[in-house]
């Protein structure tokens, strides 16, 4: 009989969001007339920017003609999109990133998992706690961890707590690590990192010959012009970091699928015998072998994000969701909840009532207010006692959700 990847059996029962769906479905079966408001999973609700729609319509018409038809595109993405990304997202902020260091993909979730394909085994890995579950689960699947201990932590991982006591600032590990996952603005806490904080991480990574995997999926929600949007705004980061970005949240591409990963050509790792190898070549080989690229139509839609019309429309989308976050923060603060995040990210992180754990508060909101949120414990041990609410919904739903929560 064929053998399975037994590392999957080490995963804790139920990925966070499927477990939420299971509980919600069970509730709906018992309460078919209930009007649920979903502020849980970070999926957008507003329509795509019209600039993107127009560009994709034009691309569809091109594909329907003999002269405009395109088959397989470059696995790394079309050059015109990569050039637009490099110019607008990096070079405009002083980052020395070129178009050929950008790899277009169908999602940063995929990239942050698939990057393990080019990393060796035995690396010491650091993650924040709480953390986006994909970082941990993908390492478990790849055999990079031991089993989950009774504490809830996986053996072999170094956990960096993010909590109210440390101001949700990721502190440097007390021991050398090889691989570091950072996400700022942070999912789930909504915390943001300053240039000073990121500089400490870059200096640590260079000193310890470590690699930073930097998830900047929510950078467009940063409101303070002094805060960095990219790890590459920090001197030396091109020698120690890979960055993941996405069009999912700023342009509403969660169902359209387009993202990109930035791998500087100067970034190097080593083989078991100590020889240096650049990560760019490894990732390029990986993508050429396992990925056929994002569709031409979708890439034209992504390119339109950088047009004047596209920039105006995506800025309005971001402002809309951040206004929702402001409403959530204000109303829950008035109701006596302790609130964090929501200022530079579309997520509000709050403390559950003292008599409830995270899942009890989830069930409380579901049953008493018909509101779906995300229990903090689903993001890690340090998330216990916290709860995440997403600003991704209509204005009327957010206002109604706040009315319901504050009245129970």
Curated annotation (Swiss-Prot):
Pathway: Amino-acid biosynthesis; L-lysine biosynthesis via DAP pathway; LL-2,6-diaminopimelate from (S)-tetrahydrodipicolinate (aminotransferase route): step 1/1. One of its GO terms (molecular function) is pyridoxal phosphate binding. The modification N6-(pyridoxal phosphate)lysine is found at residue 249. The keyword Transferase applies. Pyridoxal 5'-phosphate binds at residues 72, 108-109, 132, 187, 218, 246-248, 257, 292. It holds the Pfam family Aminotran_1_2. Keywords: Aminotransferase, Pyridoxal phosphate, Transferase. Its cofactor is pyridoxal 5'-phosphate. Homodimer. Belongs to the class-I pyridoxal-phosphate-dependent aminotransferase family. LL-diaminopimelate aminotransferase subfamily. Involved in the synthesis of meso-diaminopimelate (m-DAP or DL-DAP), required for both lysine and peptidoglycan biosynthesis. Catalyzes the direct conversion of tetrahydrodipicolinate to LL-diaminopimelate. This is LL-diaminopimelate aminotransferase. It comes from Prochlorococcus marinus (strain SARG / CCMP1375 / SS120).
């Amino acid at each position: 009989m064929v053998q399975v990847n037994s590392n999957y059996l080490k995963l804790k029962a139920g990925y966070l969001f499927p477990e939420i769906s299971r509980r919600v479905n069970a509730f709906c079966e018992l309460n078919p007339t209930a009007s649920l408001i979903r502020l849980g999973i970070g999926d957008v609700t507003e329509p795509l920017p019209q600039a993107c729609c127009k560009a994709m319509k034009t691309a569809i018409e091109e594909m329907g003609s003999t002269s405009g038809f395109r088959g397989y595109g470059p696995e790394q993405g079309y050059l015109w999109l990569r050039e637009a990304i490099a110019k607008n997202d990096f070079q405009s902020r002083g980052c020395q990133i070129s178009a050929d260091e950008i790899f277009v993909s169908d999602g940063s979730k995929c990239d942050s998992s698939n990057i393990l394909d080019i990393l060796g085994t035995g690396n010491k890995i650091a993650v924040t706690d709480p953390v986006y579950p994909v970082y941990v689960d993908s390492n478990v699947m790849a055999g990079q961890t031991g089993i989950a201990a009774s504490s809830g932590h996986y053996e072999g991982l170094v956990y960096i707590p993010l909590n109210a006591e440390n101001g949700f600032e990721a502190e440097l590990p007390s021991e050398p690590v090889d691989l570091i996952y950072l996400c700022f603005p942070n999912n789930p806490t909504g915390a943001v990192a300053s240039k000073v904080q990121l500089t400490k991480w870059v200096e640590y990574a260079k000193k310890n010959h470590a690699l930073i995997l930097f998830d900047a999926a929510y950078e467009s929600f940063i409101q303070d012009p002094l805060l960095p949007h990219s790890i590459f705004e920090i001197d030396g980061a091109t020698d120690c970091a890979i960055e993941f970005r996405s069009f999912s949240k700023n342009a509403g591409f969660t169902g359209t699928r387009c993202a990109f990963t930035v791998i500087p050509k100067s970034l190097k790792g080593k083989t078991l015998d100590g020889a240096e190898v650049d990560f760019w070549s490894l990732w390029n080989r990986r993508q050429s072998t396992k990925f056929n690229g994002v569709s031409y139509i979708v890439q034209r839609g992504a390119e339109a994000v950088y047009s004047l019309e596209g920039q105006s429309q995506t800025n309005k989308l971001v402002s809309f969701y951040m206004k929702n976050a402001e409403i959530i923060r204000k109303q829950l603060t008035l109701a006596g909840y302790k609130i964090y995040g929501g200022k530079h990210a579309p997520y509000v992180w709050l403390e559950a009532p003292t008599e409830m754990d995270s899942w009890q508060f989830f069930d409380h909101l579901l049953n008493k207010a018909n509101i779906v949120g995300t229990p903090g414990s689903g993001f890690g041990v340090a998330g216990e006692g916290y709860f995440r609410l997403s600003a991704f919904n209509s204005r009327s739903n957010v206002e109604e959700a706040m009315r319901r929560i504050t009245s129970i």
